[in-house]
Amino acid sequence: MMENYVTLSIETHLFFARIMKEHALFLEAGFPCKETQWIQRADRLRNEFENLLRQVIQFNCGLMNHEILKSQELVTQFTLQAERRTSQLTGISIDHRITMAEQQLEADCSGNRHKRMRRSIDQWNRKAIQLLDELIGFKESI
């Protein structure tokens, strides 16, 4: 039971935190230059989702399903190139190290870290909910 909770949480965060990070990036890049407050808010949210991704990647240690990695649903062979091009065209700084680290993720490492991960997972889940609520509220206010 604990193993499923940890694995599903990690996989969910890797998938949805990237999508939400990209939503914030699209907002940031799409606002007219004069909308500085909206741009700054979108940038802050994007950075928060990047931080969440970094934390999950750092602590993953193979606690995810091999099929998820094989499917390329987290990152594809085009993701890094697309991020670099987006940075060039928009001037928005995207942390490409996150994508490179995701490309290096491995599944099914030996070792039982699930119990130790529980507290981190709970914190990430709370943070993700808070960020999602904030991003949804931001999008509704536009």
Where are these regions (language model features)?
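Surface-exposed peri-terminal alpha-helical interaction modules
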Residues: 1-142
